[in-house]
Amino acid sequence: PSDHAEVSVNDMRVPHSAVVGRIGHGLDVAQNFVHQNRIRQAAQSVGVARYCVQESVKYARARKTFGRPIAQHQAIQFPIAEMHAEVEMLRSYVFKVANELDRKPAESVSDQVAIANFRANRLACNAADLAMQVHGGIGYTRGKPFEHIYRHFRRYRITEGSDEVQIRKIAAYLFGYAGPGKQPAAKKDTGA
């Protein structure tokens, strides 16, 4: 659960020693924090997706139907193997982006942070959903962590910028509306 508060201040004096960054540029400071938080969310999401895969493999090896472990069925193997591949690819990408964020100005890697955040948060939800499916009825109960993981990580697709906000950021960089490759605005044809 998250708390939401509304704060309002009037005629407040802030001593110079308490000012963070340049006056009038508070959004820059906040955006830097947002980028840091988004990459942390991405790392957490990849970690939990990895956990869901590992627990699914463990359960599939142990759970037997008709005398055979369900891990012997391709209908169980293939989705888990696909999820594992996605987790490992995204894990490498999140490490790469986190490294870039440590070395470069946040705005120069903002699109990469958005990609990592968007894909990792979706991956966590998909991995939790798969784990519930593999575990069957017990996977949906509170006796296993997957329903909680799904609920917790589903909110990451809303907080720190919704999926749509992340996609918009990616598109803005991709099409030259933002970032280092930003194209100058086209001049309007006045017909003269």
What positions do the PLM features span?
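Alpha-helical interface subdomain recognition
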Residues: 6-12, 16, 23-192
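FAD-binding subdomain of flavoenzyme oxidoreductases
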Residues: 1-5
